[in-house]
Amino acid sequence: MQKTATTPSKILDLTAAAFLLVAFLTGIAGALQTPTLSIFLADELKARPIMVGFFFTGSAIMGILVSQFLARHSDKQGDRKLLILLCCLFGVLACTLFAWNRNYFILLSTGVLLSSFASTANPQMFALAREHADRTGRETVMFSTFLRAQISLAWVIGPPLAYELAMGFSFKVMYLTAAIAFVVCGLIVWLFLPSIQRNIPVVTQPVEILPSTHRKRDTRLLFVVCSMMWAANNLYMINMPLFIIDELHLTDKLTGEMIGIAAGLEIPMMLIAGYYMKRIGKRLLMLIAIVSGMCFYASVLMATTPAVELELQILNAIFLGILCGIGMLYFQDLMPEKIGSATTLYANTSRVGWIIAGSVDGIMVEIWSYHALFWLAIGMLGIAMICLLFIKDI
């Protein structure tokens, strides 16, 4: 009798552990590829800077189209588990193609298409985790927050490992390592993640349901808010290394230390935000994130020493920790009947942020300076703050 009573708990714990591993492995697969992609294109494919920029923009646009198509399909019919498994398979194919092919146009077409399907595994995993948590009575906020923390942990480990594999061995070894991550991820999905059929109503935890027109308006506004926040962050990520080296004349090692510290601090900030979300609300937390981001970008402009630049990463961690942890939950609660679309919509705000940042970056630097980009980032956060004030807190 004792054995029977403990079995469900063990099954639930095993399933939760599987979700955490899938989140980490999909994060590692992405963290291995993204940081070195521009170097791969320039060194291995001999792509010119404009071709590198076009590759990133094309990847973002294709990712938005593919992920939104799959999200609508998954919310209406089908099993998310099967979809995640297929996305992992596409990830293996994409990494294998990048490992051996050196034709720019093949990678831009076939490679980007396969990678776009592969990247959808992550938002679909979060959607399945939310549905599973609702069905089993788990605390959805902290469960989703812990899952998102695995992505951040992957980005602490992934980039240094990517550079070590690519520069110490070869890009082929790096991409095959990412392919192995997708294979292991697919096995875990197949063996341990639950199947939840779309035609069975999901019993969700209590969420305040707004009238349809209000929810659509708030969802659009939240999309603008998160897109502006990601655009500001991406402007910083693109230009911070050059600003540190060319403007402040500090070492390139400092840029890696800044990214590593921010990623490490982001995890506890994310968990703290998840813990206090029900007490102070999502909107106030997002407002705190925006204010922290504004203070961070303004302070970076005034800082001149490595110690201060490193200390300021606490503000960056607050900004990113709340955006990554609470932003997705905000979308899901605004669209409770379309969890897949909500999660994918949040993921696409990051892609839109890359498109915006990449489009204005080169022009701003040519006309003005790196300083102007930080002020532009602050202005983007100002737009995000105004839009946020018109969104109902739920």
Swiss-Prot record:
Periplasmic topological intervals: 1-10, 71-80, 126-150, 194-224, 275-283, 332-370
Record CDD domains: MFS_Set (cd17471)
One MF term in the entry's GO annotations: carbohydrate:proton symporter activity
Biological role: Involved in the efflux of sugars. The physiological role may be the detoxification of non-metabolizable sugar analogs.
The entry's keywords: Cell inner membrane, Cell membrane, Membrane, Sugar transport, Transmembrane, Transmembrane helix, Transport
Keyword Cell inner membrane in annotation: yes
Membrane topology label: Multi-pass membrane protein
GO biological process, one term: D-glucose transmembrane transport
Database matches in PANTHER family: SUGAR EFFLUX TRANSPORTER A-RELATED (PTHR23535:SF2)
Residue ranges annotated as Cytoplasmic topological domain: 32-49, 102-104, 172, 246-253, 305-310, 392-394
Organism classification: Bacteria, Pseudomonadati, Pseudomonadota, Gammaproteobacteria, Enterobacterales
Protein name: Sugar efflux transporter C
Family (UniProt): Belongs to the major facilitator superfamily. Set transporter family.
Protein localization: Cell inner membrane
Transport is among the record's keywords: yes
InterPro entries, A to Z: MFS, MFS_dom, MFS_trans_sf, Sugar_efflux
